Amino acid sequence: MKVYNFDKVISRDGTYSAKYNNKGHDIIPLSVADMDIPVADFIVSELSVANQKGIYGYTLLSDDWQQVAAQWYQRHYSWKVNPEHIVFCPRVVQAVSLFIQNFTQPGDAIVSLTPAYHPISHAVEVNHRVLLESALLYRDHHYEIDFADLEDKFKMACCFILISPHNPTGTIWSEDNLRKIAVSYTHLTLPTNSLV
């Protein structure tokens, strides 16, 4: 297995980096999704091959992308997913918006844990749904779900947006937390499928 140097500093100057454009200010960017380590060599190599063609037009998904995604879920989670049920969406916020538009109605209440990644909270509101925020508890240097508050919010909601790792806290919800949510709050449902 290749050893990677995670201490190597790579300048982001001239790359239009969203998190470093304000570097003249006294701030430390702590993004969750924008890491400061290089991607794996094999990815750089494959992109270099594609770059040699010199054409940067629109592309289509490969014919087997759904099958590859289904195999990944099976391999990593022992979850057998019908490849035809996998839908491509280029960004998480758009995927959340599409879900909201297709599985809830204007005026419906949707629960989210806070603090929250603002673009996802905004997706609830811009789609004319009511955002119910359940504040996380900060205890002993980590965040916890306030299950009493969450249960109260669930009584008024038809949908729950769960993000793990949570953004912006970086919290990865434990299996116990996920089971408690799934078992306790199964009334948040689609016609035959639980949303939690």
Model-predicted segments: where are they?
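Hydrophobic pocket-lining residues within nucleotide cofactor-binding pockets
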Residues: 35, 136, 190
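Conserved small/polar residues in nucleotide/adenosyl-binding loops
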Residues: 186-192
